[in-house]
Design a protein with these regions (language model features):
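N-terminal Rossmann-like NAD(P)+-binding subdomain of aldehyde/semialdehyde dehydrogenases
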Residues: 2-108, 136, 278
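C-terminal segments
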Residues: 2-23, 42, 90, 282-287, ...
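Short, well-ordered beta-strand elements within core beta-sheets of diverse protein domains
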Residues: 25-35, 118-119, 261-264, 349-360, ...
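A glycine- and small-aliphatic-rich helix-loop capping segment at beta-alpha/alpha-beta transitions
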Residues: 133-139, 199, 216-220, 236-238, ...
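ALDH superfamily catalytic-core signature
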Residues: 5-6, 13-15, 131, 209-339
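Glycine/threonine-rich beta-strand-loop-alpha-helix active-site module
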Residues: 530-617
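Rossmann-like NAD(P) dinucleotide-binding subdomain of oxidoreductase/dehydrogenase enzymes
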Residues: 98-239
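ATP/NTP phosphate-donor binding region
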Residues: 459-546
Length: 619
C-alpha cells in the first residue's frame, strides 16, 4: 500500500515514489564518483568546508529562529567546529583507491565507498550535524540523503544546500547531497529501509536509533547521554566549576555530551556550591523542586519535556513558576541520589543540572553508575581530580566510551578541543548503548577496506646451538669455558659404569679454578617426567651454573627438561608439551634460560638431540 503524508492542506506526497526518486538519483551520483581521485575528493570537501564556514552565522541564526532553541553565538561556534575542526581532521585521510601498501608483508589496502548514506539529524544540533555528515560522506565518495527533524527542516535544508552547491561547483555530481523536502516519520522510515540505501548514519533519540538498527542494513546510530561528572576532593574547585558552567550553559545544554548531574565529595561540597552561586547559578529551594521537576520532566514517558529542551535557565524557571535572578545561567536541583525515583537525574538537554553529595569515592562511583544506568550507558562520564590512580579507577569502572578528566564535558566529548579524540558530532556508545561503534564517528566509518594479500611462504627455521665443537679431543673445550664453577652432569647409569662420566670429570678438573661437580645418573631409556622432576630437584638443591648432558638422546632430552624447570620453575609441562605449526606463533611460550649454561656431549649418533631444541619425555 502506498503511504502518503500531507505536504499542505490540499496536496499529498507519494512517500514511496519520493524516496525511490531520491535513492535512484543518489545511486547515479555514487556511480559518477567511482573514478574520482583523492585529489578531486579533497578539493570538493575543502570547498564544502569553506562554504559552510562562510555561512556559519546565518545558519546559526536560522536554527535559533526556526527551532526556538539554543543560543545564536554557540550555534555559530558549532557550525565553525563542524566546518573547521572536521575538515582539519579528515583532510589528510586516504579514502580513495590504495590507502596502504606494505612491501614486506605483501598486504595492500584499497578504500571503497560504502554506498548511499541515509543521514538522520536532530533538532538540537541541526545545521552543524548536517555540515558534519555531508563532509564525511563526500570525503568517502558516498552520496548522502538526509531526513531532517521536522522542527529544523528549513535551517537543515539550507545547510545542506550550501555544502551541496559548493560540492557541485567543485566537480561533484548533481545529486551528491539530497534531502526529504516534506518530512514525516513515514518518509524517514521509508528512506532508512529503502534497498538503494547502503548505510544509516543516525543521530537522535533512542527510538530513532533503534529504528536505524532495525533496518537490516549497517547502521551508525548513536544513543542518548546521561552524563555524570564527579568532582573529587582533590580537584581544583574553581576550574572544575568553571568547566561545568562552560559546558552546561553552552547552547543551553543541548549537546548530548553535556553534564546532567554533578557528584561532589562532602569535604568540598560547600565550596563547590559557593563557587557555583558566585557565577549566576541558581540552587532550587526544597519547596521549588517539585515545580521544576514537573516543568522539566515528562515522567509518563520517562524523559525530558520536549518543550524545555534548549531553553534558557530563566525561561525554564518561568515555566516552572520559580523566580530567579536576572542573568541566571543554570538551575541546580540538589538530590539525595540518582535513579528512577529521582526524575531530575535523567537526561535534561537544558541548563538544568542535578547535584548530589558523595561520602567518598566509592559512593561517588555508585552515583555515577546509577546515572549511566538511567539512559546514559556507553556515552560519557567525567571526573575532576588530581589523583591519577583515581582517574584510572574511574575509567575502569564506568560503562562509558568517553571518560573525560578535568574537562568540560560538552566540548570535551565531541573531541579535539580539550583532548585529542576524533572530532565528531556523532558519538558512539558501543554495545553499552546498543550501538555498533564506541568511538566518535568520522570518515573512517564510511569506507569499505579491501585487502589485497600477495602470496608469502612462511619462513622456515631451524635452531642450532651457538657453538658446536667436533673432531677428536673436542672435549678439552671444557677446560676453557668461561663461568664454570658448579657443574651438574646428567647421564644414564652406563656412562658411570663404563667410565665416560670420569672422563668428563677429569677434563673439568684440569681447569685452573676448583669446580664442584654433582652427578645425576638415573636417566632411563625414554625418560619419564618423574626422572625430569627428580633431576630438577637435585639442580635446585645444588644450584649449578653449568649443566652437562652426557650420553645418547635420552640423557640429553632429560637434561633439557631438567634445565627448563630449573631455570623457570613456573613452567607448565602441559603447556610445554603442546605441538605447534610455527614456532614463532606457538600458543605456549617457553622462557629463555638466564642463569645456566647447557652443554651436550653425545656418545652416539642418530637422535640429533645435541643440536636440536626438542626434547622427548614420556608422561
Amino acid at each position: 500500500m502506498v503511504k502518503t503524508v500531507k505536504k499542505e492542506k490540499t496536496e499529498t506526497v507519494d512517500v514511496s515514489s519520493m524516496i525511490d526518486e531520491l535513492a535512484t538519483k543518489a545511486n547515479v551520483a555514487l556511480k559518477a564518483m567511482e573514478d574520482f581521485t583523492q585529489e578531486q575528493v579533497d578539493h570538493i570537501v575543502h570547498q564544502m568546508a569553506m562554504a559552510a564556514l562562510d555561512q556559519h552565522m546565518p545558519l546559526a541564526k536560522m536554527a535559533v529562529e526556526e527551532t526556538g532553541r539554543g543560543i545564536y553565538e554557540d550555534k555559530a561556534i558549532k557550525n565553525m567546529y563542524a566546518s573547521e575542526y572536521i575538515w582539519n581532521n579528515i583532510k589528510h585521510d586516504k579514502t580513495v583507491g590504495v590507502i596502504n601498501k606494505d612491501e614486506q608483508t605483501g598486504l595492500m589496502e584499497i578504500a571503497e565507498p560504502v554506498g548511499v548514506v541515509c543521514g538522520v539529524t536532530p533538532t538540537t544540533n541541526p545545521t552543524s550535524t548536517t555540515i558534519f555528515k555531508s563532509l564525511i560522506a563526500l570525503k568517502t565518495r558516498n552520496p548522502i540523503v538526509f531526513a531532517f527533524h521536522p522542527s529544523a527542516q528549513k535551517c537543515s535544508a539550507e545547510a545542506a544546500r550550501i555544502v551541496r552547491d559548493a560540492a557541485i561547483a567543485a566537480g561533484a555530481p548533481e545529486n551528491c547531497i539530497q534531502w526529504i523536502e516534506q518530512p514525516s516519520i513515514d518518509a524517514t522510515s521509508a528512506l532508512m529501509n529503502h534497498p538503494g540505501i547502503a548505510i544509516v548514519l543516525a543521530t537522535g533519540g533512542a527510538g530513532m536509533v533503534k529504528s536505524a538498527y532495525s533496518t537490516g542494513k549497517p547502521a551508525l546510530g548513536v544513543g542518548p547521554g546521561n552524563v555524570p561528572a564527579y568532582i573529587e576532593k582533590t580537584a581544583k574547585v574553581k576550574r572544575a566549576v568553571n568547566d561545568l558552567i562552560v559546558s552546561k550553559s553552552f547552547d543551553n545544554g543541548m549537546i548530548c555530551a553535556s553534564e546532567q548531574a554533578v557528584i561532589v565529595d562532602k569535604e568540598i561540597y560547600a565550596s563547590v556550591k559557593a563557587e557555583f552561586e558566585a557565577h549566576n547559578v541558581y540552587f532550587v529551594k526544597p519547596n521549588e523542586l517539585q515545580k521544576l521537576e514537573d516543568a522539566v520532566m515528562n515522567e509518563g514517558k520517562y524523559a525530558v519535556n520536549p518543550a524545555i529542551v534548549g531553553n534558557s535557565a530563566e525561561k525554564i524557571a518561568e515555566l516552572a513558576g520559580i523566580s530567579v535572578p536576572k542573568g541566571t545561567k543554570i538551575l541546580v536541583a540538589e538530590l539525595e541520589g540518582a535513579g528512577p525515583e529521582y526524575p531530575l537525574s535523567r537526561e535534561k538537554l537544558s541548563p538544568v543540572l542535578a547535584m548530589m553529595k558523595s561520602n567518598n569515592a566509592e559512593h561517588a562511583f555508585e552515583l555515577c553508575e546509577a546515572m549511566l544506568n538511567l539512559g546514559g550507558l556507553g556515552h560519557t562520564a567525567v571526573i575532576h581530580t588530581e589523583d591519577e590512580e583515581l582517574q584510572v579507577a574511574f575509567g575502569l569502572r564506568m560503562k562509558a566510551c568517553r571518560i573525560l578528566v578535568n574537562t568540560p564535558s560538552a566540548e570535551g566529548g565531541i573531541g579535539n578541543i580539550y583532548n585529542e579524540m576524533i572530532p565528531s558530532l556523532t558519538l558512539g556508545c558501543g554495545s553499552y548503548g546498543k550501538n555498533s561503534v564506541s568511538k566518535n564517528v568520522s570518515s573512517i566509518n564510511l569506507i569499505n577496506i579491501k585487502t589485497v594479500a600477495k602470496r608469502r611462504n612462511n619462513m622456515q627455521w631451524f635452531k642450532l646451538p651457538p657453538k658446536i665443537f667436533f673432531e677428536k679431543n673436542s672435549l678439552q673445550y671444557l677446560q676453557k669455558m668461561e663461568n664454570v664453577e658448579r657443574v651438574m652432569l646428567v647421564c644414564d647409569p652406563g656412562m658411570v659404569q663404563f667410565g665416560y662420566a670420569d672422563i668428563v670429570r677429569k677434563e673439568l678438573q684440569k681447569r685452573k679454578n676448583d669446580v664442584k661437580i654433582e652427578v645425576f645418573s638415573d636417566v632411563e631409556p625414554n625418560p619419564s617426567t618423574n626422572t625430569v622432576y627428580a633431576g630438577t630437584k637435585m639442580m635446585v638443591d645444588f644450584q649449578p651454573d653449568t649443566v652437562i648432558a652426557l650420553g645418547g638422546g635420552s640423557a640429553m632430552d632429560a637434561a633439557k627438561g631438567m634445565w627448563m624447570f630449573y631455570e623457570h620453575p613456573d613452567t607448565e609441562f602441559f603447556g610445554a608439551k603442546q605441538k605447534f605449526l610455527d614456532i614463532r606463533k606457538r600458543t605456549y611460550k617457553i622462557a629463555k634460560p638466564e642463569k645456566t649454561q647447557f652443554v651436550c656431549i653425545p656418545t652416539t649418533s642418530g637422535t640429533g638431540s645435541e643440536v636440536t631444541p626438542l626434547s622427548l619425555i614420556h608422561i
